[in-house]
């Protein structure tokens, strides 16, 4: 009976050690996060006019399908867009100032809406026989790092279709 009790006590001590070590590490991570957040809230507004804004090449889209998707696409294309995927709000505040966070988030949301809407619009273009216009838009989206499986699949199907025709 004594060896089992000794093993159990040693197990509890080791477990307690690892739990405390994990708590200390977690507390350190939290303290670093809140310190970074505190610093980011003190950053003044910086110029964002020179950022790499995404501009959809509307002049290369000659088609007028007169659909609600197309109307939404063209309305969205007029709005400023930035691909800020993977950048935290804290990092945005540190880099561009707290006052710019709301507008940068809006520009990022415009880009996210563009990525979500593009596959539907490209599908409508393909169905209307405008495969080259659809391909150009899909390639443009890939070029601005629009990470979407739907875009990739549509572009792949267009590539497969064109290679099978040749």
Predicted segments — roles?
Residues 124-125, 158-159:
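Residue at a conserved register position within TPR or TPR-like alpha-solenoid repeats
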Residues 141-142:
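Alpha-helical solenoid scaffolds that mediate protein-protein interactions
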Residues 2-113:
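N-terminal alpha-helical interaction modules that lie
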Residues 117-118, 152:
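TPR repeat positional signature
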Residues 93-97, 159-166:
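Alpha-helical linker/edge segments of TPR/alpha-solenoid repeat scaffolds
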């Amino acid at each position: 009976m004594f060896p089992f009790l000794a093993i159990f006590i040693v197990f509890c001590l080791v477990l307690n050690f690892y739990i405390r070590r994990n708590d200390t590490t977690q507390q350190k991570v939290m303290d670093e996060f809140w310190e970074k957040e505190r610093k980011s809230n003190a950053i003044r507004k910086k110029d964002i006019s020179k950022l790499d804004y995404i501009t959809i090449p509307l002049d290369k889209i000659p088609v007028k399908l007169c659909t609600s998707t197309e109307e939404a696409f063209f309305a969205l294309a007029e709005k400023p867009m930035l691909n800020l995927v993977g950048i935290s709000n804290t990092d945005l505040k540190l880099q561009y100032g707290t006052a710019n966070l709301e507008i940068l988030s809006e520009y990022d949301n415009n880009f996210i809406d563009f990525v979500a809407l593009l596959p539907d619009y490209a599908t409508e273009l393909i169905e209307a026989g405008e495969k080259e216009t659809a391909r150009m838009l899909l390639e443009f989206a890939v070029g601005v790092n629009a990470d979407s499986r739907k875009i990739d699949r549509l572009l792949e199907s267009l590539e497969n279709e064109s290679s099978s025709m040749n």
